[in-house]
Amino acid sequence: MKKTFLTVLLFYIFTGIAVAQNLSKTTEYKILLTGASFASPQNGWFEIGCRKLNAEAINRAIGGEAIANTANRMANGTLYSKEELENIDALVIMQVHNKDVYEELQLKDKYTDYEVPFDRSNYAAAYDYVIKRYLTECYELRNDTTSKYYNTPYGKPAIIVLCTHWHDCRTVYNESIRKLAAKGGFPLIEFDKYI
């Protein structure tokens, strides 16, 4: 009887500890980052920031890439999975090459109007594609019978966060990303102001 009691007691104690440890590992948010070397996992700033926010960091930044690569990965379906699209709370874009990402002359009305794959000749068009495609994919979850956003009026709420470069010498990029953020109503992380 004593052994049975001790076994049951130990079972409940260890189960409680396991559950408590598992609960402490849960996160409130999931944030996906795309970018180049400044954002790559080796730098660690994104992962540290996510830990401070109690968020799961999904870092898809790759050194040497540009926004065209992000657009191409979206077109190929390799930037995020359907499950990740369903569950991420924000898409953070940190493609901070010193290029104009706001120039509107060659932008298309819909992301489907762009020819893929992208090259690096038009950063504004690639940014536009990434933004419009993400917004559309979130909206269209309302028509996906397997989505938790199925039959909702507007699909999944889409949050896109843009970033300046932390070095203020990237004037072309930093100025144009501010315009793009203001135009789209996107949150902007102003690294150049606070670093």
Which residues make up each language-model segment?
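Conserved SGNH/GDSL esterase-like catalytic core that processes O-acyl groups on lipids
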Residues: 25-33, 38-125
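Sec-exported extracytoplasmic/periplasmic mature domains
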Residues: 54, 96, 132-140, 153-154, ...
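Boundary at the C-terminal end of the N-terminal hydrophobic targeting segment
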Residues: 18-20
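Sec-dependent N-terminal signal peptides
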Residues: 4-14
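Extracellular serine-dependent O-acyl
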Residues: 158-164, 172-195
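Serine-dependent acyl-ester chemistry module
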Residues: 98-121, 144-157, 165-175
